[in-house]
Regions:
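Signature for HUH/AEP ssDNA processing cores
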Residues: 4-138, 145-161
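Low-complexity, flexible helical/coil segments
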Residues: 139-141, 168
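Flexible helix-coil linker/hinge segments at domain or subdomain boundaries
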Residues: 163-175
Length: 175
């Protein structure tokens, strides 16, 4: 059994992206709409944050929050220090246009078969994968982790090549 700190260290060693900002999941109580937005230290502070009148991307007062061990701890436990639901994401594209990982998303009705075929293709060419069930339960992400940052364009080409190879064996797979 690993200590909480060891679990955080393992998670951070795999799911590496930008350290200066991370996306946080939100869910609107009014509309039920959900998504991810950059975590901001000024969010909803009266007189500073002008949401919803102004979008975060256009806000002169935005102050992104960095990825910390606490952020990872909250993500892994599912709630923040105040006990509120907490889910963090990762911005994989680094500022120099490299990345530490590639995630491929499958969410069509045949996602189970598609993921299996895609993972088989990757393993056949010697690439280890991690398969993660989507939050909704109606899809999955297939993750590839690199030992060092690689050009994002190269990672994308690798993913496209694997999809093309998979499609030659499983014609039902669509982009």
């Amino acid at each position: 059994v690993s200590s909480p700190q060891a679990k955080i260290a393992l998670f951070r060693s795999l799911f590496r992206g930008r350290d200066d900002v991370y996306p946080r999941r939100f869910e609107s109580r009014k509309t039920g709409r959900s998504g991810y937005a950059p975590a901001c230290a000024n969010e909803w502070i009266r007189g500073v944050c002008e949401k919803p009148r102004i979008k975060c991307a256009e806000c002169p007062n935005r102050r992104f929050l960095p990825v910390t061990d606490d952020v990872i701890r909250w993500h892994l436990s599912g709630s923040d220090a105040e006990g509120q639901p907490f889910v963090a994401g990762v911005y994989p594209l680094l500022q120099d246009e490299t990345c530490w990982l590639l995630a491929v998303d499958f969410d069509k009705s045949s996602w189970r078969e598609d993921v299996q075929a895609f993972a088989d293709t990757a393993r056949r060419v010697g690439l280890p994968v991690l398969v993660e069930r989507s939050r909704s339960g109606n899809g999955a992400h297939v993750w590839f982790f690199f030992e060092e940052p690689v050009p994002a364009a190269m990672a994308r080409r690798m993913g496209c090549h694997l999809i093309t190879e998979t499609m030659s064996a499983r014609h039902e797979l669509s982009m």
